[in-house]
């Protein structure tokens, strides 16, 4: 597979064309950002850890019948993926109250949500990724009602699969965000990544934060926490 020019450079990943029109290469960088890119630092090993963590999770999801863009690992920080037409909407599933939900509603951090909540946010850093609803998505042409229904169905299936996976590793899956795209055959496919950058994970017993909140909140030992999560799951680093 020939790696060609860079198509897009995000906050933590770069996207490259290949000689296959239906495939791209994602490069996971060591860049670590918070607050919509206003704070950026380099954390050694982060690109490698997130790339291998993501590959492990995506393969678990594929095995559970969830279509993902993952194809194969190419290097410590590179992965081959299906080319998707991304829908500019983040799907957020919450099992416990944390982050923006606590700020918006004034509820206690760590409160168990029964049932889980499912939320949508417009993927737009300049606007602060605003909270939206399904009618906004359809009205503004960001996606169709059918696509949204499939995105929700897949998001909840991901929650079911990964909640058990993390629970078995002594971790609480507090919340997570997912992004989806449309493949060349018209199907909705899980894209982007699943790593401690885009979810909240707490130790089941101590409630120690094991995710990017360690960076956001200045708790330190960010990569050490990521690696501990990976080791608990059996991710080969």
Swiss-Prot record:
Q: Please provide the record's keywords in A-Z order.
A: ATP-binding, Ligase, Nucleotide-binding, Purine biosynthesis
Q: What Enzyme Commission number(s) appear in the record?
A: 6.3.2.6
The UniProt similarity line reads: Belongs to the SAICAR synthetase family.
Reaction equation(s) it catalyzes:
5-amino-1-(5-phospho-D-ribosyl)imidazole-4-carboxylate + L-aspartate + ATP = (2S)-2-[5-amino-1-(5-phospho-beta-D-ribosyl)imidazole-4-carboxamido]succinate + ADP + phosphate + 2 H(+)
Per the UniProt record, the source organism is: Pseudomonas fluorescens (strain Pf0-1)
The protein's gene is named: purC
Recorded GO cellular component terms are: cytosol
Top EC class for this record: ligase
Q: What is this protein called?
A: Phosphoribosylaminoimidazole-succinocarboxamide synthase
At the highest ranks, the source species' classification is:
Bacteria, Pseudomonadati, Pseudomonadota, Gammaproteobacteria, Pseudomonadales
Which CDD domains does the record match to this protein? SAICAR_synt_PurC
Q: Which GO terms describe its biological process?
A: 'de novo' IMP biosynthetic process; cobalamin biosynthetic process
Annotated SUPFAM superfamilies: SAICAR synthase-like
Q: Name the domain of life.
A: Bacteria
Pathway field of the UniProt record reads:
Purine metabolism; IMP biosynthesis via de novo pathway; 5-amino-1-(5-phospho-D-ribosyl)imidazole-4-carboxamide from 5-amino-1-(5-phospho-D-ribosyl)imidazole-4-carboxylate: step 1/2
Q: Which PANTHER family match?
A: MULTIFUNCTIONAL PROTEIN ADE2, SI:DKEY-6E2.2
Keyword ATP-binding on entry: yes
Q: Which InterPro entries match?
A: SAICAR_synt/ADE2_N (IPR028923), SAICAR_synt_PurC (IPR033934), SAICAR_synth (IPR001636), SAICAR_synthetase (IPR050089), SAICAR_synthetase_CS (IPR018236)
Q: TM segments?
A: none
Respond yes or no to whether keyword Ligase is given for this record. Answer: yes
**Any Pfam family matching the protein:** SAICAR_synt
Question: Under the GO molecular function aspect, what terms does this record hold?
Answer: ATP binding; phosphoribosylaminoimidazolesuccinocarboxamide synthase activity
């Amino acid at each position: 597979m020939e790696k060609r020019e860079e198509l897009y450079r995000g906050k933590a990943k770069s996207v490259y064309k290949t000689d296959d029109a239906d495939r791209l290469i994602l490069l996971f960088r060591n860049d670590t950002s918070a607050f919509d890119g206003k704070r950026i630092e380099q954390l050694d090993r982060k690109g490698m850890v997130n790339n291998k963590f993501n590959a492990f999770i995506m393969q678990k999801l594929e095995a559970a019948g969830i279509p993902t863009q993952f194809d194969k690992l190419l290097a410590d920080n590179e992965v081959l993926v299906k080319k998707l037409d991304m829908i500019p909407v983040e799907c957020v599933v919450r099992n416990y109250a944390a982050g923006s939900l606590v700020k918006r509603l004034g509820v206690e951090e760590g409160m168990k949500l029964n049932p889980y909540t499912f939320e949508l946010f417009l993927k737009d850093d300049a606007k602060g990724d605003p909270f939206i609803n399904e009618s906004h998505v359809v009205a503004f042409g960001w996606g169709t009602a059918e696509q949204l229904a499939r995105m929700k169905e897949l998001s909840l299936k991901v929650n079911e699969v990964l909640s058990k996976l993390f629970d078995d590793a002594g971790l609480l899956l507090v919340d997570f965000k997912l992004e989806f795209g449309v493949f060349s055959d018209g199907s909705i496919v899980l894209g982007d990544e699943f790593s401690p950058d885009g979810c909240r994970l707490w130790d089941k017993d101590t409630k120690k934060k094991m995710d990017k909140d360690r960076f956001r909140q200045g708790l330190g030992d960010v990569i050490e926490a990521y690696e501990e999560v990976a080791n608990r799951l059996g991710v080969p680093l």
